[in-house]
Amino acid sequence: MSSTRIIPFRPWFAGGLGLCAAAFLFSAGPATSMCQLVSDTTQGNRADAHAEEGMQFARAGNLTSADSELRKAVALAPGNAEFLRDLATVLAMEKKFDESTSYFQRALKIDPHDVAARRYLGANLWQLHRYAEARQNLRILLHANPGDPQALLLLGMVSENTRDYGTAAKTLASVPTLVRAQPESIAALARSYYHIGETAKARAWLNELHNQAAGVQAVLLGAQIADEMQDYQTAETLLSSVATHYSDQTDLQYRLALVKFHAQRFAESSHILQQLLDDGHKTSEVDRLLASCFRAQKQDEEAIHVLQDAIQLDPENEASYLDLAGILIARKQISAALELAQRMTTAFPDSSRVFVSKGSIELAASDFTDALGSFNRAVQLEPRNADAMIGLARAQANAGMTDRAKTTLDQAIARFPEKSRFELELGQVLLKEAETGVKSAELRAEQLFNSAIAHDNRLAEAHYELGALALGRGQAAGALLHLKKAAKLDPSSAKTHFALSRAYRRLGRNDEAAKEATLFDKLKE
């Protein structure tokens, strides 16, 4: 089933660092000032003159001229930490974060104890998603000044970005005034509370978004966070709260339909979307979500028809093609899917996602040679595309190139920060190898499944594989733990319910076994 998600609203990422840098550069207070006004400059000192002129340009908002003058000052006095800091700040305000970072680092080599420079170096590194380096600099700063509020705020944001939700919640909650200043930080704290099971605190912080200067957009961000965290009632409440204030009622209704879709209230979602279409608001996004609702209700023909309309309405939107391809594969309409694949690659010759879809169709058609070519092309177009790497490994394994498939997945585990999917895939390749008599393969497969769960406990397939292994060894009680988890994560998996039936039967729990067998029979149809 296609799961439609709205791209996260990131207002602070867009402008927050520039505002911080401006305050840093022009604040009169000694604790937060990035540079001291050069009032005692000697008239004949060319470097000081360029620096002073650069500062005047910066204060006037002319960042291009400020940049030019400060570069001249740094060229004449490369060992002057103040000039380096000033230039780094102007560069940050221009959103030249990589270059700004290098100048902050040069300044800190000269003066490692400059609190403000280190704080804003941390902000730069966070903005660049260089989280490990950002954390290191912020830890140094907090070691010297444990109560630095800006450093605590940034450390909380870095922790949330790296999924260290306990640290994020603790750190952000320690600076509530700063958190309240930006919707992004409120969202980060709420998301962290959700992840550590503090739902009431998460909701309380999301309610704070009503008081934001960003207005409706801040509340919409809160609704998105609640939706992502499966707190659907809170998401709906937040959306309803802006119904009379939001000028774009079409967008609001679409968001509400999206929440209801995620809550598996497909009929309600469909009703809202159909009303939008009836009112003339026909877009490919509305069509795609409506198609997902139809598919969830096993109305595949209706879904196909709606997606065909979406493609005709917006032929340059590859997402509609990809959704349609997914349905055709699921329905085993291989000929139609192959025809669509050719249309997609003609329309989107440089799309990695399109070549992943084409490769998946070719795998379904047992055309492993063409699948290898498609997935290789997808990897060339986007080397960090996890779906492309997994597809390539599957094509290699199906083509009898097991060793190459294992190498592909081992390399992906080493390269990608999100390892769990690759560990699961490699474990499944090894299980097939174990069936040929390679005894060590099953042991490593089990280790990989456990590692995958350690990295992401929501992987239903990994829980299923561990349950199946335990069941095969006669360990029904151990199998039951994993299989119940797998069924909770993926209730529509027929094979999981079949395995659960077997486990319950072996434990003498015949009534529960019968219920699972009934579910299996229903789902396999």
Indicate where each model-derived feature is located.
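Structural marker of alpha-solenoid helical repeat scaffolds
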Residues: 76, 110, 144, 177-178, ...
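Helix-start (N-cap) detector for alpha-helical repeat units in TPR-like alpha-solenoids
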Residues: 47, 81-82, 115-116, 149-150, ...
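Canonical tetratricopeptide repeat
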Residues: 86, 120, 154, 188, ...
